[in-house]
């Protein structure tokens, strides 16, 4: 398998996980929905955090969120996302169970578009050189919420979740050789219909937290000496967390033997720190896409990848930039040879950092670590209880997912890894 397959680990037969931090008896929750103030539509992936702490989460695809607090003190809650003016609201003002958070678009002035145009390759080269200045030089332990879902057509056929720890070595070396992931607890819920059984297994799962951290892992997108292998273009800048961002689109101009990516990268104009990337696997070579992600399939089954996309975002805290959120969507078709029709599947995973310990002496041993070739779905049990994550921060499930869970629970038993 090519280089991409080593780093885009994702496990299919696949399904959902979540992480958080344990809270004291005085814990309380703030919750609500984040919407665009102009069109009233829900805003997804809004970063929501407690000021002065490393605690946070993101809004779900409907804009809904919940954030657990370790005590009842009045702490400011921050809301930020690309293209919108950030907000800071006292937690006491969010005592209602049905809070509506309205965020305004933050337009970029024409003068800013003109002034901050420049050579995209030079900007990227400088940003790569400044990684040791802009990212943690400590050994950090991230607490993360992780979730996987899989749909057959429009119908959910499985979901799995886990609380995970992610050990990160310093960013001055762009290598993930010693970064590791450990599953603390997890659960899964699957359809009991035999026709929904999917024997395809795709590499990855919780190791996305290590493998697609493109700032730390030079093998995901490009290293400095590979910049000439890509075409770059300056796009219209955007604001994120009140800071102007360069937006640079890229696509490969030199084709390799492994799957490659095209997409957009966001770079903080002042710090020249990478803050976000949206990228997809080049769709013109299905063989390379398959080699990058397929771990195992039954004989006679045809696997046809349609789309493989990633979003990776980072958050600026006290002058340093930290990994914050990762999502991966994979669309593919499967059928047995000599069958007339194929089935369409969508596998989706996402994870968010909910807490962080900096400069820690804690380690994850190789024995405890989630291995590159392990399949997450295979190592967590079935269990589904409403209070399972009562003392953890998670990404709230969407309404469609909640309905799917209710239907799946009616079809059979569920298990848990305690």
State what each model feature region is.
Residues 1-33, 48, 110, 418:
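Bacterial Sec-dependent N-terminal signal peptides
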Residues 29-43:
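Structural motif
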Residues 40, 66-74:
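Short Pro-Gly-centered beta-turn/loop motif in secreted/extracellular proteins
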Residues 46-50, 77, 115:
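Hydrophobic beta-strand segments
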Residues 50, 78-89:
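A short, solvent-exposed loop/turn motif at the edges and junctions
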Residues 54-64:
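Short, acidic Ser/Thr/Gly-rich low-complexity loop/linker segments typical of extracellular
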Residues 102-230, 241-244, 293-294, 299-418:
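Surface-exposed, low-complexity/disordered segments
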Residues 218-269, 273-280, 315-316:
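Extended beta-strand-rich segments in extracellular/periplasmic secretory proteins, especially
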